[in-house]
Curated annotation (Swiss-Prot):
Organism (species): Aspergillus oryzae (strain ATCC 42149 / RIB 40) (Yellow koji mold)
Enzymatic reactions: Hydrolysis of terminal, non-reducing alpha-D-galactose residues in alpha-D-galactosides, including galactose oligosaccharides, galactomannans and galactolipids
EC top class, as a word: hydrolase
A GO molecular-function annotation: alpha-galactosidase activity
Quaternary structure, from the entry: Homotetramer.
Cofactor: Mg(2+); NAD(+)
Domain of life: Eukaryota
Name of the molecule in the record: Probable alpha-galactosidase C
Glycosylation sites: 49, 57, 162, 186, 194, 366, 433, 452, 500, 720
Chief location of this protein within or outside the cell: secreted
Signal peptide limits: 1-27
One record GO biological process: polysaccharide catabolic process
Record-linked InterPro entries: Aldolase_TIM, Alpga-gal_N_sf, Alpha-glycosidase_related, Glyco_hydro_27/36_CS, Glyco_hydro_36, Glyco_hydro_36_C, Glyco_hydro_36_N, Glyco_hydro_b
Alphabetical UniProt keywords: Carbohydrate metabolism, Glycoprotein, Glycosidase, Hydrolase, Magnesium, NAD, Polysaccharide degradation, Secreted, Signal
Length: 751
């Protein structure tokens, strides 16, 4: 016990021996851009507005965290952490640890847990050396951010357990322009006996003692990305996915903020795991008040055996720091992802307005009805026509969700001569009154198989299954095991054949169920690695195809998918009122340029709500990929007359949405008048989306203050007057709305 002053003093002395009394003076081994400064004892990563510092205790080799926040220079004030020792917490649990291992007196959740052949899970990872790399190496088999030597510098810190011969490399890549630090870790078995990695975090950080709050995105099918903000309490709290994919339920995103932090003011730390599989986000406030945040693999679905010489690499985690509130955090994510994550040529290219056949026809179509829908789409000004589910399956035709998945050949009853004649006819159509040819796109769900399919009858062993346990169906389908190379090759070959057969310029890649009955805990990660191989092969082979990800809506809206697919269907819920919440929630981490958003028919298929077409269109065009989800023949005449103008407006705002900065001025959960401002990359143009949700009877309408403008510049507002940026930001503007579900799109031009 530490009851007596003498024992407390002895304990304090021993604790200081382990972790040191404070940072030592930094030597000057510096990267060319000053982004990384290291001397083997202290380490500093420097961005335009961020500093990240940690050090090595020279006695024990432990890494100790010092700072992650606003820019600092010079020596650090010598802090302390060993005063209050009158408790039972192990000594290591009282300090801020950079990469906490397991079993040595730190009883908080560890960043790594490894079971050795003898059964114990103790590790003693000590600092060995470091290296600084200009640029950023790619992660083997995993999506990762990228950049040139001018964009990013990487620090790798090498740790080693002398008792078990386990090596861990910690990678820190700093993008100074974005105040972003990207981290990952790998574990290598340097010994002769097998080890099993049971937990591995990509990112770990211990915040100092202070009151903090955490923000996450929760939801379910058709109500993804609902913002949740709560106090960080003492003890363990967190969330994750065990579905085998990132999921609708929780997103692999976390923000840590102060209670006073708002959209535009205060500090915010954002974390986003670049991974599409099951994950875990853990936040623990320990007994000393230190808050630990970890993001990485879900330990319940990780049991990864490493033989001698083998390595397990974690996904990477992007962390950003903002002193400009939650909005500043989001804009850092957006800029980084547009420029250094999404590899597609379409990352910042104008996206064609499209019409998807799903909500217009569902499964009920043939070649003539599809062509009729394409004709009517072109007449409205649509430039891309997408044929959704229902076009494939020969022996088991896909006329419902009960059959056909896995058999990627055109349904001979619907398309007797294959897809080529249809594609040729559709791509001869002109978009509206222009000379632009209509493009053709296709829906696929290659990771699935129906039991009613030729594929399943020939290869029942290709689906996920656990011995003799029943194979649980969801949506009448099973999941192909992409951990198997032969399954990966089959999917690559089938999709290649389809894309080579006709002029298909767009693919919507869907995924409509969770993973059950996996054969082993490691299969989940093996599946994701196989999926990434498929994505990488196909997107590299067909770089001119615009790929869109989907998983029953936003079930796989994560950075891992974004590397390969520049846009993702945000939600199967196309109700415009709910979409405002979903899209603004998604924008906490993900750029609007990546969001698919469609104007659909009313009453809405998901909610039954009827909302004016203008409001529906304005909400949809806040996404980078604007489209229609309806049958034009079913539109009322007044609605049909408005649609071409909405398409033209969407095309006008699209370049600003794709490359500009987003400012969430008001949130739908906080105001009857949510508003979003997009400002072009050069600052010369801006577009304001302004909504009234409910009626406002006999009551004033609030003024709306803009943000992000140049206070000294003058702006033309919709061509009807000129106002200074200072006036628009400090006084604001005011509009009258006529009714509920009214909306306005306002253009600003810098003069």
């Amino acid at each position: 016990m530490f009851g007596s002053p003498k024992r407390a003093a002895l304990a304090a002395a021993s604790l200081l021996a382990v972790f040191g009394n404070g940072p030592s003076v930094m030597a000057q081994e510096t990267s060319s851009n000053n982004a990384v400064v290291a001397d083997g004892k202290t380490f500093a990563l420097n961005g335009e507005n961020v500093s990240y510092r940690f050090r090595v205790n020279e006695t024990t080799g432990d890494l100790v965290s010092d700072h992650f926040g606003g820019s600092i220079t010079g020596n650090l004030f010598p802090g302390f952490g060993a005063e209050a020792l009158g408790g039972w917490v192990g000594l290591a649990g009282r300090f801020r640890r950079e990469f906490p291992d397991h079993g040595r007196g730190d009883f908080r959740i560890p960043a790594v847990r490894i079971r050795q052949e003898a059964g114990y899970t103790v590790t003693d990872l000590q600092y060995q050396s470091y290296s600084v790399i200009p640029g950023k190496p790619a992660l083997p088999g995993l999506p990762s951010t990228f950049g040139s030597e001018e964009d990013v510098t990487t620090l790798v810190v090498h740790l080693y357990d002398n008792y078990s011969s386990i090596a861990v490399d910690l990678s820190y890549s700093i993008f100074p322009k974005y105040d972003a630090i990207v981290r990952s870790a790998n574990v290598t078995n340097k010994g002769t006996q097998n080890i099993t990695v049971e937990a591995l975090s990509s990112f770990s950080f211990d915040f100092p003692y202070e009151d903090l709050e955490m923000i996450s995105l929760r939801g379910d099918w058709a109500r993804e990305a609902h913002r949740q903000r709560r106090k960080v309490e003492y003890g363990l709290q967190g969330f994750g996915s065990s579905t085998g994919f990132s999921s609708h339920l929780h997103n692999p995103f976390l923000a840590i903020v102060h209670p006073s932090t708002t959209e535009s003011q205060g500090e915010a730390w954002g974390f986003n795991l670049v991974y599409t599989g099951s994950f875990s986000v853990d936040v623990e406030k320990g007994s000393q008040g230190l808050t630990r945040a970890l993001l990485g693999f879900n330990p319940s679905q990780l049991s990864w055996q490493l033989g001698a010489g083998e390595t397990l690499t974690s996904p990477e985690c992007v962390s950003v720091y903002s002193s400009d509130g939650i909005g500043g955090m989001s804009r850092s994510f957006h800029r980084l992802y547009r420029n250094h994550l999404i590899k597609s040529k379409f990352a910042t290219s104008d996206r064609p307005p499209l019409l998807n056949s799903w909500e217009g026809l569902y499964f009920d179509y043939n070649e003539s009805t599809i062509y009729r829908l394409a004709e009517e789409s072109a007449a409205l000004g649509v430039k891309l026509f997408v044929m959704d589910d229902g076009w494939f399956g020969d022996k088991y035709p896909r006329v419902s969700d009960n059959a056909g998945l896995g058999d990627w050949v055109p349904n001979p009853d619907r398309f007797p001569d294959g897809l080529t004649p249809l594609v040729e006819d559709v791509t001869k159509l002109k978009a509206g009154n222009s000379s632009t040819d209509l493009r053709f796109g296709l829906w696929v769900e290659p990771e699935m198989a129906n039991p009613n399919s030729t594929l399943y009858h020939e290869h029942p062993d290709w689906v996920l299954h656990a011995g003799q346990y029943p194979r649980t169906l969801q949506r009448n389908q099973l999941v192909l095991n992409l951990a198997l190379p032969e399954v990966q090759d089959y999917i690559i070959d089938e999709i290649t054949n389809i894309l080579n057969s006709s002029a298909i310029s767009y693919v919507k890649w869907d995924f409509n169920r969770a993973m059950h009955e996996t054969p082993s805990p490691s299969n989940d990660h093996e599946y994701i690695l196989g999926m990434y191989r498929v994505f990488d092969t196909l997107t590299t082979r067909f770089p001119d195809v615009l790929w869109e990800g989907c998983a029953s809506g936003g079930g796989r809206f994560d950075p891992g998918v974004l590397e390969y697919f520049p846009q993702i269907w945000t939600s199967d819920n196309t109700d415009a009122l709910m979409r405002i919440t979903i899209q603004l929630g998604t924008s906490l981490a993900y750029p609007p340029s990546a969001m698919g958003a469609h104007l659909s028919a009313v009453p809405n298929a998901q909610t039954g709500r009827t909302i004016p077409v203008k409001f529906r269109g304005h909400v949809a065009m806040m996404g980078g990929s604007f489209g229609l989800e309806l049958d034009p023949a079913e539109l009322q005449e007044d609605e049909k007359a408005e649609v071409p103008g909405l398409i033209a407006l969407a095309e006008k705002v699209n370049p600003i949405i794709l490359t500009g900065d987003m400012w969430r001025l008001r949130l739908p959960e906080e105001s009857n008048w949510p508003a979003v401002l997009f400002i072009s990359e050069d600052g010369n143009q801006a577009v304001l989306f302004y909504f009234q949700l409910g009626p406002n009877v006999n009551h004033a309408t609030p003024w709306l203050r803009l943000q992000g403008l140049d206070p000294k510049a003058t702006y033309s507002v919709d061509g009807n007057g000129s106002y200074s940026g200072a006036t628009l930001m400090n006084m604001g503007l005011q509009y009258k709305f006529e009714s509920d579900y009214d909306s306005k799109v306002v253009f600003l031009q810098k003069q």
